[in-house]
């Protein structure tokens, strides 16, 4: 008699799925030989297979638990990846506008480059013209260099003359200082002389005023009469007052008079007598 096949499950090596193991069934054919002890041998084999199945079931349970944990972790990663995909989609939308702006900028740059091409050609012509002008200036620079050398020699000669002039100027400065001192002393003397002149002028004008005042005095010439006279006189801003007294003898042979004049500069006086002899 034949025994039915026995199905067992065995753990298969990871086939590339993250942290997930595969389990597949395996068929074990029992010993179907009809010989003494054959059934017994088949039962023993079944018992052995049962134990193996229990062991495999325990291992499968551990693998299932591990797979459950891994699936949970993968779920979190899938959610994170989904958010990253959404963020990327938004960033791609933003970049689309920037790309359009960049495309416009590139087109504008192309147009500007086209305009600059003409300017570059004009600059190239200007550079060529500058080279020609530089060539002409080279000769002028050589001429100027010779002129500078000549000027340097002339300056050296002038330096000697300037030094000589500086010595002369220093000597003149010393002489000028001496002359200034002499002129200052002379000025002081002139000032003193001017003061004396002013004083003499004032006194002279005062004397003339006194004389004018004295000349204005008039006395009584009658015999035996004593008379008093007053007068005033002036000369170039100076004014004087005068007074006098006179006497004529009874026989009219003698006349006497005394007078005095005064102003701010001083006092003048006079006295006189006259006699008749026949």
Swiss-Prot record:
Record localization: Cell surface; Cell outer membrane
Stored InterPro entries: Pilin-like, YadA_C
Tree of life domain: Bacteria
Gene Ontology terms: cellular component: cell outer membrane; cell surface
Annotated signal sequence range: 1-29
BP GO terms, sorted: cell adhesion; protein transport; symbiont-mediated suppression of host complement activation
Function: Participates in bacterial attachment to several surfaces, including various extracellular matrix (ECM) components and a hydrophobic abiotic surface. Involved in adhesion to host epithelial cells and is required for full virulence in mice. Also implicated in the resistance to porcine serum.
Written domain comment of the UniProt record: The signal peptide, cleaved at the inner membrane, guides the autotransporter protein to the periplasmic space. Then, insertion of the C-terminal translocator domain in the outer membrane forms a hydrophilic pore for the translocation of the passenger domain to the bacterial cell surface.
Protein name as it appears in the record: Autotransporter adhesin BtaF
């Amino acid at each position: 008699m034949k025994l039915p096949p026995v199905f067992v499950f065995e753990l298969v090596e990871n086939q590339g799925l993250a942290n997930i193991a595969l389990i597949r069934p395996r068929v074990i054919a029992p010993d179907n030989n009809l010989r003494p002890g054959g059934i017994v041998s088949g039962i023993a084999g079944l018992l052995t297979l049962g134990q193996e199945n229990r062991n495999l079931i325990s291992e499968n349970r551990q693998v299932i638990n591990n797979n459950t944990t891994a699936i949970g972790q993968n779920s979190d990663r899938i959610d994170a990846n989904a958010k990253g995909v959404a963020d990327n989609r938004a960033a791609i939308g933003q970049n689309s506008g920037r790309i359009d702006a960049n495309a416009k900028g590139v087109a504008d740059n192309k147009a500007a480059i086209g305009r600059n091409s003409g300017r570059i050609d004009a600059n190239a012509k200007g550079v060529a013209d500058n080279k020609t002008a530089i060539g002409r200036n080279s000769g002028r620079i050589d001429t100027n260099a010779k002129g500078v050398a000549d000027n340097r020699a002339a300056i050296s000669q002038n330096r000697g003359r300037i030094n000589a002039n500086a010595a002369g100027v220093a000597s003149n400065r010393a002489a000028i200082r001496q002359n200034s001192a002499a002129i200052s002393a002379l000025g002081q003397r002139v000032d003193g002389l001017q003061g004396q002149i002013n004083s003499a002028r004032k006194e002279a004008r005062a004397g003339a005023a006194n004389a004018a005042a004295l000349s204005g005095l008039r006395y009584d010439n009658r015999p035996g009469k004593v008379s008093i006279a007053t007068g005033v006189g002036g000369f170039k801003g100076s004014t004087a007052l005068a007074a006098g007294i006179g006497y004529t003898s009874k026989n009219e042979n003698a006349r006497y008079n005394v007078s005095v004049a005064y102003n701010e500069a001083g006092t003048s006086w006079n006295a006189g007598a006259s006699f008749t002899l026949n």
